[in-house]
Amino acid sequence: MSEDKIGWHGTTILSVRRNGRVVIAGDGQVSMGNTVMKPNARKVRRLGDGSVIGGFAGATADAFTLFERLEAKLERHNGQLLRAAVELAKDWRTDKYLRNLEALMIVADDQVTLVLTGNGDVLEPVGGIAAIGSGGNFALSAARALVDYEEDAEVIARKALAVAADICVFTNDQVTIETLESRV
């Protein structure tokens, strides 16, 4: 999938799992071409009964469709995120309608963090850090550097998103964060 097809231009989502906490953070900027349409969008949220958090990059309507589908899968599989994510990825890859949705997601529960793509990928990040979106590589690099010096997952996420916002013109500094206590 090319960056143009999935609409990466316009957001940064970062997940950090550290010292018994998992955080997913996202900036608030929504861009259309080279125009900022909204500076304070909420691209990070709790799913289902609140035991799963997620963030998205890509087309907003597509992401909400995928969040709804994931919530249904979570309910069907008794809150088992990995199983629900694999089932969603199968549907996303094979369903004629879902296959055309243009979004990426990072989701996490108290045990696992996953990156979900429209290619059918369900990826567990190495080191408990994952990022997607136009500023994702900047945030990922900053977070990986910060884990050697900072213990708190939320502080790492905020600082890493600040770095991404300083570099990526499609990322701003209006950050939304969701946090869960982690077993890992």
From Swiss-Prot:
EC numbers for this chain: 3.4.25.2
Gene Ontology molecular function: metal ion binding; threonine-type endopeptidase activity
Keyword Hydrolase: yes
SUPFAM superfamilies: N-terminal nucleophile aminohydrolases (Ntn hydrolases)
HAMAP family per UniProt: HslV (MF_00248)
Annotated protein name in UniProt: ATP-dependent protease subunit HslV
InterPro entries documented for this protein: ATP-dep_Prtase_HsIV_su, Ntn_hydrolases_N, Proteasome_sua/b, Proteasome_suB-type
GO cellular component: HslUV protease complex; proteasome core complex
Positions bound to Na(+): A165, C168, T171
Keywords: Allosteric enzyme, Cytoplasm, Hydrolase, Metal-binding, Protease, Sodium, Threonine protease
Complex formation: A double ring-shaped homohexamer of HslV is capped on each side by a ring-shaped HslU homohexamer. The assembly of the HslU/HslV complex is dependent on binding of ATP.
Function as written in the Swiss-Prot or TrEMBL entry: Protease subunit of a proteasome-like degradation complex believed to be a general protein degrading machinery.
Position of the signal peptide: none
UniProt key word Metal-binding: yes
Entry's family note: Belongs to the peptidase T1B family. HslV subfamily.
Reactions mediated catalytically: ATP-dependent cleavage of peptide bonds with broad specificity
Compartments where found: Cytoplasm
BP term (GO), one: proteolysis involved in protein catabolic process
